[in-house]
Curated annotation (Swiss-Prot):
The keyword Repeat does not apply. Belongs to the MHC class II family. GO terms for biological process: adaptive immune response; antigen processing and presentation of exogenous peptide antigen via MHC class II; response to type II interferon. Residues 216-225 are annotated as: Connecting peptide. It comes from the Eukaryota. Ubiquitinated in immature dendritic cells leading to down-regulation of MHC class II. This is H-2 class II histocompatibility antigen, I-A beta chain.
Length: 264
């Protein structure tokens, strides 16, 4: 399903319903504000094969009236919207205009946005990490973070030693970033054992092949050995760099000296 952004019908209409006397207004502005606005929505299924148009009316953030193209007339959501629903349903020209909006508004705008929204693809960024840094054989939660992708249809699966995990999976669902991209967290509840390999696999329309990111369960001693190895490697690089610096500095100093005993 493709969804167009909700568009205010004209603008938010601010109604000031309380009139204060001039002396009071000079002292303190305590007038209440009331907000009435409407939203137009277009819902598309399989492109423009099936289109649904909604016109929703709100008063103080509460919906009270709507027109649904699937219904073909106005329906009151609360008692406040009932008089308007009865009034507009009695006017054929208003109903004809709203029913035609499926074509004049929704399909028309779909053609405008089609070149931008439908072909647009943004590849996801995938990272895997545990929520707790504790010894193995303890309950832990592995997180597969999938971020900054478009469109929103995405499939995330967990594997342990090459076998797909079907239970213990929790997801945040699709989260909108507000910049035409999405993110989601898919977590696996497990008790990691030494030597196990956990894999998060992501499939998305922007990818020609699934993306896989691995997390290997290691004992504390193995982690310490790995950190020691990395630390030794970095320390070796530092000493090598210092040695090369001293060597080239000495070479430069010697080349600047004139040999003694030669006639000039």
């Amino acid at each position: 399903m493709v969804w167009l952004p909700r568009v205010p019908c004209v603008a938010a209409v601010i109604l000031l319903l309380t009139v204060l006397s001039p002396p009071v207004a000079l002292v303190r502005d305590s007038r209440p504000w009331f907000l009435e606005y409407c939203k137009s929505e277009c819902h598309f299924y399989n492109g423009t094969q099936r289109v649904r148009f909604l016109k929703r009316y709100f008063y103080n953030l509460e919906e009270n009236l709507r027109f649904d193209s699937d219904v073909g007339e106005f329906r009151a959501v609360t008692e406040l919207g009932r008089p308007d629903a009865e009034n507009w349903n009695s006017q054929p020209e208003i109903l004809d205009e709203k029913r035609a909006a499926v074509d004049t508004y929704c399909r028309h705008n779909y053609e405008i946005f089609d070149n931008f929204l439908v072909p647009r693809r943004v590849e996801p960024t995938v990272t895997v990490y545990p929520t707790k840094t504790q010894p193995l054989e303890h309950h832990n939660l592995l997180v597969c973070s999938v971020s900054d992708f478009y469109p929103g249809n995405i499939e995330v699966r967990w594997f342990r030693n090459g076998k797909e995990e079907k239970t213990g999976i929790v997801s945040t669902g699709l989260v909108r970033n507000g910049d035409w991209t999405f993110q989601t967290l898919v977590m696996l509840e497990t008790v990691p054992q030494s030597g196990e390999v956990y894999t998060c696999q992501v499939e998305h329309p922007s990818l020609t092949d699934p993306v896989t990111v691995e997390w290997k369960a290691q004992s504390t001693s193995a982690q310490n050995k790995m950190l020691s190895g990395v630390g030794g490697f970095v320390l070796g690089l530092l000493f090598l760099r210092a040695g090369l610096f001293i060597y080239f500095r000495n070479q430069k100093g010697q080349s600047g000296l004139q040999p003694t005993g030669l006639l000039s």
